[in-house]
Structure formats: structure tokens, C-alpha cells
Amino acid sequence: MRLSISSTNVKEWSGDVLVVGLPKGDPSTTAVNLESRFPGVSSALNQQAFEGKTGQKLVLHPLANGNPQRLVLIGLGDADAIDLDGIRAAAAAAAQASIGCKGCLGLQLPWDSHHPDHAARISAEAVRLSLYADQRFQKEPEERRLPTALELIGLPASAAAGLEPVNATCAGVELARELVAAPPNYVTPAALAETAAALAHDYGMELTILERADCEARGMGAFLAVSQGSDLPPKFIHLIYRPEGAVKRRLALVGKGLTFDSGGYNLKVGGAQIDMMKFDMGGSASVLGAMRSIGELKPAGVEVHMVVASCENMVNGSAVHPGDIVTAANGTTIEINNTDAEGRLTLADALLYACEQKPDAVVDLATLTGACVVALGDEMAGYWSNNEALAEALDTAADAGGEGLWRMPLRQSYKKGLKSLLADMKNTGPRPGGSITAALFLKEFVSQDTAWAHIDIAGPVWSDKGKGVNPAGATGYGVRTLVNWVCAQA
């Protein structure tokens, strides 16, 4: 999508579809301004009792001949309450109102109380992301008439700087959405490795794929235990972005890569949504999407290592048993008291490997626990961190990306719930505080001197009904936060 700032007055703008946001109480004033160009606007507002309330929308076809072909007025609610999230929601609504029109979408919102760069970026991201639709698996995809260009009306020319990362960031989100949404007979461990190979080729990154024998040689017993019930070979993926010039910061992004999770012998039953366990590789999709964006944006001075331990968790005669004891790459022995808590086993070896790269900070993303969904719902991810500066940076990055993120406690006293009679630790603790003990388990495989954060995306990885910038389905959650975090350190 072509993105630009327009200095043209809204009354003179001549694109294909014009969307104007109206705060509550403002419609009459705006209507007077628009009336000279679009006769009948005032009467239409009165007939529809349009007051500018949040969610109100009025679609007009004001000009019999010429552009714009469509004029859309959307209500924004109280003017004092229009924050950046309100701008984002309004831009998403504008995008939906533009469906059916090709050409250029013009958007005017009350930008004045916001930094121009920020307003431009979030508006453009919201428009592109909310127009996304996945029709790859349909015999006859519906033809969609969509805008090919977006002009933000009324922002200063300097706001164009905010548009520069938008298309690259959104492309990363879209890649993550495609990976999460695709069924597990399409997205396999090998398919994730192929995706990484394509990124390495397209953006000049370095790629290492460890096969089963390589992982055995490195002692990755936790990861391999999860994989042994599947006929599909595991893939351990290490993708590296190296900037031109000196490296000031080295970062690691680790994603959980379970391309299908049956639960193993602790089989998912009842309301466990086994049919949706294709999204258990959502963490790997997020880090792959982030690497796609980073590869295009090329942040200076920041080296980024992406690590994904990918496999399936299946049931056969070779599958891991409840009660088995396995050994991670650092020699830690783990009693598997629940085969459906497999993600943390794969992440244990992935985190150990990531820390071997001597990063300044490690962030892992995983659809790890239902407990986090119960606590925070499906619009927010929870995160745990051992470092205040990293936590603050992630909060800032998530806020800028419009992704809900809430810090959770790393309460050390809960670690006793992971104590095993026979091994160094168990892979699950008691049900209460389950997301906390999961984070404490992961922390055991992070170097003590390494800043680390674990983000549990089990809730926001998928949206059943869609909301805001996310159509129904895979959301691509985490990509914007990661891209913002990495680029902020350039």
C-alpha cells in the first residue's frame, strides 16, 4: 500500500473514498465545512441523528460524477478521550468503510493532540492490518476491491517519517498471521525451516538448521523428548540478522514452535480445543514475522538471533511417557509429570542455546498456558522479566504497537511447586499460579547475567470474532512489539 501525507484541504481532496472522523458534539461544525463541497451532508447528519458517538458511521455517495466516490463520517466519541488507541480504532473503522473501493483512501482524524509521527504510524498500520484477509485455502476466493493507497490529511509533512516502517512492520505481522492460521498439514517443522530459509535468502541473513542428530550431539534431551512421538523430524532453527558496521547490542528472540500439540499421552480432551492446536507455534510465527520486518528495516548496530525449536507433540509407541525423566542441554534433569506441558521443554533447550550466543537480552514468546488466558483474557499477553530496564522497554514497545501487555510476578516462593522427588525439577507445578510456575521453569534455563523476558501469548494469538486492527483469526500478536523493541535500540 502506498502511504503518504496530504496537505490538501479536506474540502478539495479528490481521491476515491474520503473518511472523516467526527468527535462527539462536533458534527454540526464539520458539516458546515463540508457542505460547500458535499451539499446535503448537514441534512443527512440530522436525518440519521448522527452525534459523533463512538461506533456511529454514515456512508454517503455525494458526487454523481467525480471523486470522491464515497464519503464516510465516523463517530469518535468524546474529544477529550481520543487517545492513540482511539485513533487506531478509528483508522481501522475507516479501512473497513473503504472496502469496495479501489484507488486512494483519504483519512482525516483529530490528530492535533498527538505527536504527528506517532499518529501517522498507528493510523497507517491500522488501515493496512485491518484490511487483511486470508483466502489461501478457498477454491474460489472472493474478489476484494481495496484501496491501494492511503493519504493522511491534515498532518504536517514531517509526519511522513512515521510512515517509513509501516509496510515492513505490517508485512511481518501478515507473515505471522499466515503461519498461525495455516493448518498443521501445511505448517510443519520443515515448513518453518523453509520460511526461515526464504527470509535468509531475501534479506541476507545467516541460517543454521540443526537436525535431530545435531540436537542429540548437543544434548537437547528436553526438546527431543517432545518430538519423539511424531513421524515428522524436528527442526532447530537459528536465524541471524547482522547489521552493517559495529554491533552495539546483541538480542535474541526465541519462539515456541509446536506445529501441532495433541497433548501427548496427557491427551487434550473436552474443551481443550485440540482442533485449534495449530496455533501452538504462534511464538515461532511472531519471531519469524519480526525477523522479516527487521530484515527489511535493517536497524543499525543491533544483531538479532532468532531461535525456534520446532516439532510436533504426538502420540505413538515412541512418544514420551508421563513420568519420564529427560535431560536438558545443560544437564538439568526434568521429570515430565504432564506431557501437555511440552512447550516449556522445547523452550528450555532453545533458551540455553540462545544464551550461548551471549545476547544482551533474550525475549521468548510462547502460547504457553491456559492460566494466562484465564487471568488476562484474549486481548492481552502476560509477561515475566528478571530485568527492570527490559520490562520498561517492552512496555514502551507494546504501547507504541497497540498490543496489550501486562507484567506478571516472578514469585520465587512458587518455585517449590516444581520440586521433584527424583529429578532436579518437574515440568509443571500445582494448578494455582500455573503461568507463574511456567515462567519460573523457563527462568532456570536463562543465564543469570542475561536480561530475559517471557511473553505468554496464548490469549491474543487468535481472535475468534476479530476486533479493531485484527480480523477474525490469527492476529500476528507480538510482531509489532518485537520490531519496536529491536529498532528502539538501533
UniProtKB/Swiss-Prot annotation:
It is an enzyme of class 3 (hydrolase). Keywords: Aminopeptidase, Cytoplasm, Hydrolase, Manganese, Metal-binding, Protease. Mn(2+) 1 binds at residues 261, 340, 342. Its EC number is 3.4.11.1, 3.4.11.10. The active site is at residues 268, 344. Its main location: cytoplasm. Binds 2 manganese ions per subunit. Belongs to the peptidase M17 family. Presumably involved in the processing and regular turnover of intracellular proteins. Catalyzes the removal of unsubstituted N-terminal amino acids from various peptides. This is Probable cytosol aminopeptidase. It comes from Synechococcus sp. (strain CC9902). The lineage of its organism: Bacteria, Bacillati, Cyanobacteriota, Cyanophyceae, Synechococcales.
